Amino acid sequence: MVETSTSLVKLEQDGSLFLPPGFRFHPTDAEVILSYLLQKFLNPSFTSLPIGEVDLNKCEPWDLPSKAKMGEKEWYFFSHKDMKYPTGMRTNRATKEGYWKATGKDREIFNLQPTSYGGSSNNKNNKQLVGMKKTLVFYMGRAPKGTKTNWVMHEFRLHANLHNDNPNLRLNLKDEWVVCKVFHKKGDDREAINKQQAQAAAVDQYSAGTPNNGSSVEAGDDDDDLFQLDSIIDPSIYFSNSSAANILSAPPNMSNSVVAANYGASTTTTGTASAGSFQQQPNYCSLINKSISSSNVSSWNNMPPPPPVAEGGVHGIGSSYSLQHQAAMVKALRDVIRLPNPLGMPQYKLDDAYLWDSS
């Protein structure tokens, strides 16, 4: 004898449904479509005791069990599909912490028609296609680099064939109700959560430690006036002869560097104590005096014009090209050729533009 509904089924004060031990809400796929989802389409105000209503885009999967009306391992919800774009047909499946990703093919749901003897038949002619079921898995993070979890959802939707038996049914893909069954497979999501937290921490650390690359020179760097000269100086600006300009393009400290005879540049021998070998380097002082004309040199640092040079030159260097400009050129090219004062030129004093340190 079946107990009365008042003693068998109780409605809790919070609206959840209470069933005695042993009773479960475990409908078939066809029952979900015909007994619940179809009724929601025919009457949007339809509610069901075992199926709640949520916005899946505003809830994380681990929060859904507390929002369900009933269920211990499986939870059912009505949900209104949210479109990703107002004019598109793609469904928005993202939440704050992750997203639902479809997996596999959609499965057809058939309703088995009753036979004359009261049972049901698997005969193809006795089956009616009533809905579709899509399987989705929740991923932590953002696509396409999300971390897979053990939260799974089955999404049930109506099939257009039901319109034949229900003339009042109106299907609109942009305004569609679905029933979602959410459950958690056996397993631990701590690995996925830890991986997601590690990725977030790595992004934060990278963002905090990345220097501002908007400028190659930081404010206040007094020694960076000539930064990366080998990449920003065009030697052809300062040499009237293109072949002479190519000298600056040669790798620094090359062994036995040879200067063409037509430049009249001699070579100086330098040695390295660690390697115990000697290298031939061009005498850039001779090269500058014989290959550079003052008309091809830019005025560096807007220096004042030099005083007249006496006939015969200054400091024994016979050239109309002033020592002041030569010293500025040497300083500029020192990082390029990577030689410490290779010309043996007197040091330029900053306090007086025309005084030289001859020591």
From Swiss-Prot:
Transcription recorded as keyword: yes
One Gene Ontology MF term: DNA binding
GO cellular component, one term: nucleus
Family annotation (Pfam families): NAM
Record has Lyase as a keyword: no
Domain of life: Eukaryota
Organism: Oryza sativa subsp. japonica (Rice)
Residues annotated as transmembrane: none
PROSITE patterns from the UniProt entry: NAC (PS51005)
Keywords (A to Z) from UniProt: Activator, DNA-binding, Nucleus, Stress response, Transcription, Transcription regulation
Induction: Induced by salt and cold stresses. Induced by drought stress.
Gene3D superfamilies assigned to the protein according to its UniProt record, in alphabetical order: NAC domain (2.170.150.80)
PANTHER family, A to Z: NAC DOMAIN-CONTAINING PROTEIN 77, PROTEIN CUP-SHAPED COTYLEDON 2-RELATED
Record-given protein name: NAC domain-containing protein 45
